[in-house]
Amino acid sequence: DLIVERSFTTAATHQGYIEPHACLASVTNDGKADLWCCTQGQYNVRNLCAALVGIEGSQLRVTASEIGGGFGGKTTVFIEPVALALSRKAGRPVKIVMTRDEVFKATGPTVSTSIDVKIGMTKAGRITAAEATLRYSGGAFPCGTIDMGTQSAFAAYDLAAVRTRARMA
């Protein structure tokens, strides 16, 4: 009966989590490595660090510490591969803790978005169809936000007809 179309934008913002990024890396002479870090995704950290430092993922054990909140900002790596590389070179454990200033300058904020939404509904207000186009300004470092946005755009509604599209702009 009715079609409503709206456009929305969100700005890039930093998650503002409580504790800064910190890690402790230890690489032994036989190439095995241990990494303790503040993360929301130790398996992603293991895979990224192994690829960046050039070691087998099976040789890297990542232990996630308790975090006070990450809000999606602690799912990737910043200092962890550096600590691993330095530990391998020094033959000793290496600890890196970012200052609050370093966190805001050197870690990634959420990306900004431009979203167009089109919703079909009955005159009684029941939503019958929904469509969304999401454009993320990920720049040179696109992220997994596309998947999360397209999967959750209308997840709260029981709809028979849904279409979501997303791209990095």
Name these PLM-found stretches:
Residues D1-A169:
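Structural alpha/beta core scaffold segments of enzyme domains
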